[in-house]
Amino acid sequence: MVLDEVKDLNLKKLVVLAEDDFETREAVKNSDCEILFQTGKGYGNAIREGIKHATTKYIAIFYADGSTDPIDLKPMINKIIDDKNQIVFGSRYEKNAGSYDDNWITRIGNYFFTKFGNVFFSLNISDILFTYIVAEKNTMDKLKLNSDDYCLCVEIALKTKELGFKYTTHPCFERERLADKKKVKAFSDGFKILNYMIKKLISKLIYNK
């Protein structure tokens, strides 16, 4: 289980899940963690509610399916403490990085959205859709995130740039899932993300915000 991998780390664990997810509730009931039930639905909603209820100075978005590797947590937090970054984005597309879960559709899609963000929003990022993120809690609060779906991936990056927060990236390897299955729908969710980014671009060009 994912929680077993981080049980010896000095961190507070907050598990966000739907109230009717009885399988996960049973799996974590004896673990050293706090359980938070979503008041809404969706991938982005779970992350937003986790951020809202976190009480530590630094936070990490860590996947319950086992695809994020805890070996990256320490170097990512060091890039905040030592290098004075406010947000560190994990990346599957840098040297010494990769993904077990990627396919040609998701790779092309990620390349497109990352390029879109870098060109039109002056981002300097290599993987805009990966939300393995370590950040200052108060910085994440200031982003005032509102996406309940996968648009949250790009919302975090775009608002980080818009608000002038200092950020960097860290190469990560997305592991094979230990549990659950891929929920993202490449075309329908991709269209939502594209629509979100176009709206943000129009707002930027017309209203400069």
Where are the regions a protein language model picked out?
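Short, structured coil segments at secondary-structure junctions
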Residues: 9, 30-32
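Hydrophobic/aromatic residues located in beta-strands of well-ordered beta-sheets
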Residues: 13-15, 87-88, 167
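Catalytic donor-sugar/metal-binding loop of nucleotide-sugar-dependent glycosyltransferases
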Residues: 123-124, 148, 157-175
